[in-house]
């Protein structure tokens, strides 16, 4: 996406208003991650919307140890709703409630994150454009 006057370019994942779409990525958790619950904030913008409308984001995750089978269930999905503020502005959601990562989460291990727009739970008329997801986690030590 290009933001007009100042030629600010940025990548987004567009989630439409009628179909629940999902995105996935793998992150190697830092060595000092304590293996406990995490929270997430969604950084997003929009293609269209109005001041009374909201977007609801969902996130779930699965952690893996060496030799774990890949095809296993995620932890329970957690959602957070955020209100439309202004066309083309950065929107930062509140933090989700605690997310329990399914499987074997631990420091230094991979986690597959799965996010989506929960279209049945929101009412924003335009596409929601996901820019980033901030993950907060507990630590077991102060250094890696």
Where are these regions (language model features)?
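Short coil-to-beta strand junction motifs in C2/discoidin
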Residues: 37, 50-58, 127-130
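Proprotein-processing/basic-patch segments
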Residues: 116-144
């Amino acid at each position: 996406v290009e933001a007009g006057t100042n030629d600010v370019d940025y990548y987004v994942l567009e989630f439409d208003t009628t179909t629940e779409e999902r995105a996935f990525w793998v992150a190697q958790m830092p060595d000092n991650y304590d293996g406990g619950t995490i929270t997430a904030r969604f950084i997003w913008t929009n293609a269209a919307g109005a001041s009374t409308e909201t977007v609801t984001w969902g996130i779930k995750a699965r952690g893996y140890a060496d030799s774990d089978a890949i095809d296993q269930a995620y932890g329970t999905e957690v959602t957070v709703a955020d209100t439309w503020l202004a066309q083309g502005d950065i929107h930062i959601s509140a933090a989700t409630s605690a997310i329990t990562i399914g499987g074997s989460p631990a420091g230094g291990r991979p986690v597959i994150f799965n996010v989506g727009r929960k279209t049945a739970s929101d009412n924003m008329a335009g596409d929601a454009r996901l820019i980033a997801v901030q993950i907060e986690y507990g630590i077991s030590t102060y250094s890696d």
